[in-house]
């Protein structure tokens, strides 16, 4: 699997979600029908900061061999994040009618869960670089 592509795409998605959660938390809460009060806004902003941190981690590790002995923590952290959120979103989808964005999110997180699971539980393959 091309881990560089996986890392770049996941970094872009997490950065977009993190920026949205950091700068428009009230609007996000309103879209999902939640109260837009101080504590809820703060929790969405903190979550946005976490997403931005993961995005930076993935962006900075994009050129490394992910899944090997040194890249395993990055793969495991991503796998854990995407798996837990995928199951939480799947549970919400199964519970009843949800906005389409929740279904799209569950699908997207499920795909990242599978991708990082593949990277984590299969041996890494280094890509031969052309000689300079």
Residues covered by each model-derived region:
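Membrane-helix boundary elements
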Residues: 3-4, 17-42
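Short, Lys/Arg-enriched, Gly/Pro-containing loop segments at transmembrane-helix junctions
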Residues: 30, 68, 125-132
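Non-cytosolic membrane-interface motifs at loop->transmembrane helix junctions
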Residues: 32-41, 70-73, 97-108
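Juxtamembrane helix-break-helix junctions at the cytosolic face
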Residues: 58-71, 93-94
